[in-house]
Amino acid sequence: MLAKIALSAATFAIDRPYSYRVPAQLENLLEPGMRVLVPFGKGNRSSEGLVLSLEQAEETHRLKEIQTLLDRRPVLTPEGIQLALWMRERFFCTVYAAALTMLPTGLWYVLKEGYALAPGVDRETWEAKTAGHPRARQVMTLLHGAGGRADLAQIRAIPDGKDPRGVLRELEKAGLVVRETQARRKVKDKTEQIASLAVDPAEALARMEPRRKTAPMGYEVTSLLCNLGSASVKELCYFTGASHQTVKSLEKRGILRLQEREVFRHQLPDIQQTQPLSPLNEAQQAAYEGLRALMNGGKPEAALLYGVTGSGKTQVYLHLIEQTLAAGRGAIVMVPEIALTPSLLQLFLTHFGRQVAVLHSCLSTGERYDEWKRVRDGQASVVIGTRSAVFAPLADVGLMILDEEQESSYQSESMVRYHAREVAKFRCTHHKGLLLLGSATPAVESRYAAEMGQYHLFTLRQRYNAHQMPKVRLVDMKQELRQGNATGLSGLLREELEENLRRGEQSILFLNRRGNSRMVVCSQCGEVPTCPRCSVHLTYHSANGRLMCHYCGHSQPLPELCPHCYGRLQFVGMGTQKLQEALEESYPGVEIMRMDADTITATQSHEVLLDRFRWKQVPILLGTQKIGRAHV
């Protein structure tokens, strides 16, 4: 048997399925979608690979053999393999890179190369064979002293400054050492020990009764298990005060048995009872009926839901998802910003409970891996997340929604430069599902596709419950400057803020530029400090007194004078930090909360800030696009 494998070591130019011989012990274990370690290239260095297909073949003796099986079950379905092959052609990446993009980082492997003494090689043998070769003897001495094996990094640390690979190749040819590669996964499955009675409850208590006084903790544990049936060892020790040794002794006596149970790291709020959906108005109902007909048509469809802000597109989404779940299928909802996820998640949990999973980059590696497993194992049928949620391993996708589909954040800028909309089209085609693009300001290409009939167009022209659109007033800041107001706060804005404060109402200020000043410029020569890596203008941050690049993260101290002509530096433009300072000066004693990339750092801290704004009634919230789309 041979396997067609996509390799991580292959560049795009040589990326193709490579054939490898399947060893006899793996023939009944290996499946497409599993990862393996294989030798690759002239040096036969170990490389990760993804099994694309298996074939029966007799003439396989000339093929290299698979070294190790890394997965116990496939990490990609047949659909996932097809998607990886399609992404290679569409986004010019390798198949393995596409596969890694689909998987949570907790499933990625880290390979560590090392060398060990060959079997049967003793000290006398290698000393004789390395006589006259001091460098080789150094390596062998290190291996011998390390217990017979050392990582390549340890061997490189030998203090002579030379690359040891040449010597290692010679030692390998001489049969003195063998190369080994260890694969370690970034995150392991989290488990806990569960205790349950191994005998009838009456028998267990009868056996512990004679030891009730001499072993009271053992009796307490047994009594508790008689009432509960089973419990984690951690809970047993907590509620009874027993030690782990007590539980172990009960296991040895055959009174209870211990088993490992998988637990999930990310615990969503437990919704005891879900709420029914709100009724739709006439326009929403018309859009819903049309979209439902497309979804139930049995063929892939794409639609654009073009609705003004506040028209109730989310309610249409919820009713469509309810219909999808009723048909036994799954739904994926993508939002452009992580800040949108908490409020949307709470709304979905209220209606769909534990069927909901969340996938975004603010989860820890372990939490994201566990949520991915819940989706893969069918424990969740509704996935909410940012761009990467498009790869959620739902078995049957009936509906995929891209909210605010025009946003640039759906385009990846990392290793595989995919667009979530393109991937969603592929998946909906495969599953014969509905792709729904929602927006108040659709992308030009999406609106054009709708007008040309490539997408079905549905429109919501009125706000929900006939609410009026807010009035917009434009203020000429140049005129404000002529009148002597250089603060960045217009007279009208000050009046409205003061009126809101007087009424005890909250205000939200949106400024899509973080930092203190947009840029720093020399008043004499006009020189502007730029990033040495990206050549973009650096932004001044007053919190740390440094110039920072918002593209790559480069940071440097603010010079006192222009480095070119020693002229005086001027600060041009206003960022959120400077606006916060102006507000604090204008309204002393008033709490002003800032929400931008500089204040959102810890896991889910955007949720903490939004909750604090909601429940503690912070008077003024200032921020960038982090609040521009948040449900505050």
Language model features by range: what are they?
Residues M1-S439, S446, E451-H467:
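Accessory, non-ATPase domains that flank or precede helicase/AAA+ motor cores in DNA-metabolism machines
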Residues S364-V375, I600-G623:
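Conserved helicase ATPase core of P-loop NTP-dependent helicases/translocases
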Residues I627-V632:
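Conserved small/polar residues in nucleotide/adenosyl-binding loops
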Residues R427, L436, E445-A449, Q454-S523:
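Conserved interdomain linker/interface between the two RecA-like ATPase lobes of SF2 helicase motors
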Residues I332, F352-L363, P532-R533, T539, ...:
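Conserved RecA-like helicase motor-core motifs
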Residues T274-Q275, A303-T309, V472-T487, M595:
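Glycine-rich phosphate-binding "P-loop"
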Residues R502-E585:
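Cys/His-rich short segments
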